[in-house]
Amino acid sequence: VQPEYTVATSDGIRNGTKEMRYSLIGREVTNDTLCEHLSASGLEGTIAVVACDKPPVGTLSAILEHNRPAIIMSDGPIRPGIDSVTNEPLDIISSYQIAGSEDEELKRRIACEACPGYGSCGGMFTYNTMQTFIGVVGMQPLHMVSPPSDDKRRLDVFPDQLITYLDNMVKKDIKPRDIV
């Protein structure tokens, strides 16, 4: 499922703002959008790549509702960073912990260095919890849950594996509700 077929709100971007109130309804919006797309497309099978907090839940519920062969892969979490001054490891929690500081330069440095790359949330919050859950219930291969977003396997290995898994599911008529 290509990203343009779903709408999502990022908790990480909205956190602490008045727009955060739109976050939870993002699950339903993703579900509704994906259900409409899957129902209208006539696809025999679906590979859904999900990111951020709410799309995994909305996607899983749509796939279960639609009940045609499908598999999910997350985009992977962002890697932690290194503080350029202290050489100590940093992560998303580091940004939260320093938020109350009056040192604006320190806050900016930590915010920029704590999550230096790309990927979904690097903490054990909704995103990683849901990816683990989706893997445990059998809708995402477990070895695809935790590698970070920039892990080369996400582009070089996992897509071919997903196609093989989905092809097998289509041939054997294995549907999401048979798995979950």
Enumerate the predicted regions with their spans.
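Anionic-ligand anchoring segments at beta-strand to alpha-helix junctions in alpha/beta enzyme folds, i.e.
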Residues: 1-25
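Active-site cavity-forming subdomains of large catalytic enzyme subunits
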Residues: 23-179
